[in-house]
Amino acid sequence: MSMKWISVLLGLQLSCYFSSGSCGKVLVWPTEYSHWINVKTILDELVQRGHEVTVLTSSASILVDPNKLSAIKFEIYSAHLSRGDFEAFFIKLLNILIYDMPKDSFWTYFSLMQEFFWEFYECAQKLCKDVVLNKKLMTKLQESKFDLVLADTIIPCGELLAELLKIPLVYSLRFSPGYAFEKHSGGLPLPPSYVPVILSELTDQMTFMERVKNMLYVLYFDFWFQTINEKSWDQFYSEVLGRPTTLYELMRKADIWLIRTYWDFEYPHPLLPHFDFVGGLHCKPAKSLPTEMEEFVQSSGENGIVVFSLGSMVNNMTEERANVIASALAQIPQKVLWRFDGKKPDTLGPNTRLYKWLPQNDLLGHPKTKAFITHGGTNGIYEAIYHGIPMVGIPLFADQADNIVHMKAKGAAIRLDFSTMSSADLLNALRMVINDPSYKENAMKLSGIHHDQPIKPLDRAVFWIEYVMRHQGAKHLRPASHDLTWFQYHSLDVIGFLLACVATAIFVTTQCCLFCCRKVAKTGKKIKKE
């Protein structure tokens, strides 16, 4: 390690030593791709504040690079599969989700989605086993005396590690399908009458039939669709802990849930004390662009530029789709910077340049940027919100369609279908977003909402992590609803009791009235006889 990094580490340790003694040790159970990019922002800030951060990463990890110089520590464990196999699995999954999924059939689509989820979580369970069944590694983790586990719910295991190490747990997440984890483990109340289910692509302004559709989604996700094979995970967790338990039971013990959105994105809905929004925590003011890129941007003149990226997971696409897109881009007066790593499209215009990587945040913050063509990933959308840039959304998979629906409902985006859009569709969408001032105005309004917060999202995320470490948990924020059964939560037992009381009162009153009537009738007959 260079002297520079040794000095940095010594400085951090000394700052912690001379501070109030509140520096802690954080164990991280990470996820790949955009999830890692988001969490790493939090980790860098924790390290900057003097905390010791250790990331549990497998030898198969795709983005987590332990060899890169960093003040973050990495604990590498041997995985059952190679990095190449893990990456190939994701590429295969992406190709199926983007090109082969029958999106016009609800039942077929979600049935296949469940199959893919189960295959993914089968790999995830093996990674978890590689850690918790490794006695040497677990002994080392226990001896390290960590203060907290920071985990992403998309790959379970963080809650099991927290239970085994007997330390608090903080979650960082965007969503779970159907809000299953948030509702059943976090206890978050999400009334289907006005809160659209994630992946339903509905807004909070629902017609009667849309509310019917939303209720069907709720019932489907609650009683039919299983994101993960719960029985398998319940059995695995029970075997490891040596007592009967469930995945949801352990997840329910999470102290804080950090949701990677905010009210600039979300529709209004109830929130609980141990849930908080940290959307856009990775966003920052734009830096200067590389010289060559800045010259190209400046050459756009008054027309400005368009930024185009389909995210970190999609570096390629079919030639046919690439040519459709390139043809549309060639017809606009703006210069285009396109993140693309495939064969150069035949229809590529002189106004478009291809890059294997783009400084996306810096480009979106450039004064000449007019529009952002995005797949709808949460990180990219938040960079557009942060800088007030209107969007053309081309969602590919997962929550991306839902994200674009949110932006469309707020008047800051137009949505297109990747599989069916023509060059004319993309061209018209770009012209609309660039030339209709309402899109820019709405994007700037969202930007204003995002910036008008008492605490910055990153500071809020770090605050809650430090808060949990200071108080050895945050169980005082946990609502009592966690300890109630479903019928107690909905007061069905109380309603049943009250109905029984009313029924009993009616029955007794009726019987008394009948008795009195009979008495009066008998008395009347006696009087007549006399």
From Swiss-Prot:
Assigned EC number? 2.4.1.17
- Compartments where located: Microsome membrane; Endoplasmic reticulum membrane
Q: Which UniProt keywords apply?
A: Endoplasmic reticulum, Glycoprotein, Glycosyltransferase, Membrane, Microsome, Signal, Transferase, Transmembrane, Transmembrane helix
- Spans traversing the lipid bilayer: 495-515
Q: Which family does it belong to?
A: Belongs to the UDP-glycosyltransferase family.
| Role | UDPGTs are of major importance in the conjugation and subsequent elimination of potentially toxic xenobiotics and endogenous compounds. This isozyme has glucuronidating capacity on phenols, opioids, and carboxylic acid-containing drugs.
Under which name does UniProt file this protein?
UDP-glucuronosyltransferase 2B31
* Species this protein is from: Canis lupus familiaris
